[in-house]
Structures are given as C-alpha cells and as structure tokens.
Amino acid sequence: MKQEKLSLNDVLIRPIITEKALILREQRKYVFEVNPLANKNLVKEAVEKLFNVKVEKVNILNMKPKPKRRGIFEGKTRSWKKAVVTLKEGYTIKELEGEH
C-alpha cells in the first residue's frame, strides 16, 4: 500500500497539554497529536524544521477509542496517534514553554 507524502505542516496536529505531559517536559519530552499516516521519521523531521531543535528520539503510540455514554446514547471517542518527542540536551521548544 503506497503512503501519500505528507507536508511537514500536516504531520503535527496539536501539542498535548496535560499534567503528565507537563511533567515529561522536565525530561525534555514533548507530546503531540500527530497525523495517523505519520511515522517516526516524519515526526522527527517536522519537529526539527518547525521548532528549530534537534530530536534525540520519537516514540509513537496509537490511542484506542474509549467507550462513552450520554444518557441512553452509547458511542466511542475517536482513535488517534500520539508522539512523544525527546529533544537532545540543551534544546527546548520555546513556543510550548509557558507559565504552568
């Protein structure tokens, strides 16, 4: 199956800002929701080009849908792909560093 080429702007969807993600930032790890078609190489290239940093490694997780219910209506959340990006020593993503 041939995979279509994603532009670097289409790889990263949004940063994940959770309590756990903020704790990981102290270890130079940043968490992003990424395009389901993206692989580790595309994520690394996108982060390096967009934020002008050097990436040490990328871990990717496929998040499964969770069951949800609202009254009698049942459904599931959507599935999505998460990337944990570890930066090399001395680099931070200034755009994501805010007061927390």
Curated annotation (Swiss-Prot):
Report if keyword Secreted is assigned: no
One GO cellular component term noted in the UniProt record for this chain: ribosome
Q: Recite the UniProt keywords alphabetically.
A: Ribonucleoprotein, Ribosomal protein, RNA-binding, rRNA-binding
A single GO molecular function term of this UniProt record: structural constituent of ribosome
**Which Pfam families has this protein been placed in?**
Ribosomal_L23
Q: Which domain of life, per UniProt?
A: Bacteria
Gene3D superfamilies annotated for this entry? Answer: 3.30.70.330
The Gene Ontology biological process annotation of the record reads: translation
Subunit text = Part of the 50S ribosomal subunit. Contacts protein L29, and trigger factor when it is bound to the ribosome.
The UniProt similarity line reads:
Belongs to the universal ribosomal protein uL23 family.
> HAMAP family from the xrefs?
Ribosomal_uL23_B
**What PANTHER family does its record include?**
60S RIBOSOMAL PROTEIN L23A (PTHR11620)
Q: What does this protein do?
A: One of the early assembly proteins it binds 23S rRNA. One of the proteins that surrounds the polypeptide exit tunnel on the outside of the ribosome. Forms the main docking site for trigger factor binding to the ribosome.
Identification of the protein by name = Large ribosomal subunit protein uL23
